[in-house]
Amino acid sequence: MMLEHELVLSAYLFSIGIYGLITSRNMVRALMCLELILNAVNMNLVTFSDLFDSRQLKGDIFSIFVIAIAAAEAAIGPAIVSSIYRNRRSTRINQSNLLNK
């Protein structure tokens, strides 16, 4: 894949993720949009790592760390959302002000 195509795809994924985070009212949808953003960042890391110096794997290794953080977020995020749902009976972001109670 050419560099421009990879960067356009990454920018497209990032834009969809940002739009979803801004407009989402559901916590699960917001977590999914956050995953899209992290995947777009990983694509940029790997693309620019290959472009600037293909012999060193700094971008690839950093991308693996970001994937590990995303996996932890994917494991902990739904547990937090289900706990909030059990207590509040809603997963809407605007209805779950946790500082009031």
Curated annotation (Swiss-Prot):
Membrane topology category: Multi-pass membrane protein
One Pfam family, short name: Oxidored_q2
Listed EC numbers: 7.1.1.-
Catalytic activity reported: a plastoquinone + NADH + (n+1) H(+)(in) = a plastoquinol + NAD(+) + n H(+)(out); a plastoquinone + NADPH + (n+1) H(+)(in) = a plastoquinol + NADP(+) + n H(+)(out)
GO biological process, one term: photosynthesis, light reaction
Coiled-coil residue windows: none
Transmembrane parts of this sequence: 2-22, 32-52, 61-81
UniProt GO cellular component terms: chloroplast thylakoid membrane; NADH dehydrogenase complex
Quaternary structure note: NDH is composed of at least 16 different subunits, 5 of which are encoded in the nucleus.
Protein task: NDH shuttles electrons from NAD(P)H:plastoquinone, via FMN and iron-sulfur (Fe-S) centers, to quinones in the photosynthetic chain and possibly in a chloroplast respiratory chain. The immediate electron acceptor for the enzyme in this species is believed to be plastoquinone. Couples the redox reaction to proton translocation, and thus conserves the redox energy in a proton gradient.
Protein name: NAD(P)H-quinone oxidoreductase subunit 4L, chloroplastic
Origin species: Ceratophyllum demersum (Rigid hornwort)
Phylogenetic classification of the source organism: Eukaryota, Viridiplantae, Streptophyta, Embryophyta, Tracheophyta
Protein encoded by which gene: ndhE
